A protein has these predicted regions:
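Extracytoplasmic metal-acquisition and chelation regions
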Residues: 20-298
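Sec-dependent signal peptide recognition
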Residues: 2-9
Length: 298
């Protein structure tokens, strides 16, 4: 009996040591980053796909069930998920992932956001008081977040600190090399005049040195009217653009209309993992984004 007891005790101790951190990611980019940094010490789940608008998700029972079992919540923050995440946290009853707990990680807490409104006026559309939250379009910002996320994993799973540190060092080296390659490949894109559908590309624009000529949405998050689009056509006669960009999850109707009226190229960029069939991980996401922009800028 004593041998059986000791055997069971050793078994459960072994299971505890090998236990994985259960990560609930709000968006695919954070699930992918968690996998890069956590390796076989984590299990991951993404609440959204690359073809969903993360602003508008329902806190459905299946998501609540997943969040109940999470050890770590990895989300964008800065009000991106404000329409559903607070309800999810509350319904989960999981103290580990409540705001302020070590198990709640918001990526935008670790970078400097732009686009902070001078005044809050909801009549001006879907604006974010904390600033533009779409930081995953910049590999520079993503690396900063990665370092912070690695430190959080080490805090939560101190028995495996050396493992997470090694994963971070490896990722940092590969990511810096890839970022340099992307910048070299995209050199010809500097100054490229573009039209965007929504202000979710600002960090990509800053990183690549693109020139934003116009935005299809007169008010953020509000689909452009025919009058809005006609005003864009008039504007483009004075300041021409070469490409109109929308995210893969967005309707292409407005971009298609503008292309038909003006003849400028249009492109759907993946925006995140799974935005198209080529963007299967973080590295391929930026590979494909650069490739698409170069192709449409010719």
């Amino acid at each position: 009996m004593k041998q059986l007891f000791m055997g069971l005790l050793l078994f459960f101790i072994s299971m505890a040591v090998q236990a994985e951190i259960n990560i609930f990611a709000c968006e695919p980019e954070w699930e992918a980053l968690s996998q890069e940094l956590g390796g076989d010490k984590v299990t991951t789940y993404s609440a959204t796909t690359g073809l969903q608008d993360p602003h508008y998700i329902q806190a459905r029972p299946s998501l609540i069930a997943k969040s109940r079992r999470a050890d770590l919540l990895v989300c964008t923050g800065a009000e991106l998920e404000t329409g559903w995440l607070p309800l999810l946290q509350r319904k989960s009853g999981n103290r580990a992932i409540q705001n302020g707990a070590p198990g709640a990680f918001m990526a935008t807490d670790y970078v400097q956001l732009t686009g902070i409104p001078s005044q809050l006026d909801r009549s001006q559309g879907h604006i974010h008081a904390a600033g533009n939250p779409h930081i995953q379009t910049s590999p520079i910002m993503l690396l900063t977040v990665a370092k912070a996320l690695s430190e959080r994993l080490q805090q939560l799973d101190q028995n495996n600190q050396a493992y997470y540190q090694q994963r971070w060092t490896d990722f940092e080296q590969r990511w810096q090399a890839a970022t340099l390659r992307w910048q070299q490949q995209a050199e010809s894109l500097k100054g490229l005049p573009i039209v965007i559908q929504h202000n979710n590309w600002d960090y990509l624009i800053d990183w690549l040195g693109l020139e934003k000529v116009a935005t299809l949405e007169a008010k953020p998050g509000v689909p452009p009217t025919v009058n809005d689009l006609n005003n864009i056509v008039k504007q483009l006669k004075l300041t021409p653009a070469k490409v109109v960009i929308h995210a893969a999850y967005q309707s292409p109707r407005a971009s298609r209309w503008l292309t038909e009226k003006t003849g400028i190229a249009k492109v759907a960029l993946p925006f995140t993992i799974g935005g198209n069939t080529s963007s299967t991980d973080l590295f391929k996401l930026f590979d494909n984004t650069i490739e698409l922009l170069l192709d449409k800028s010719k």
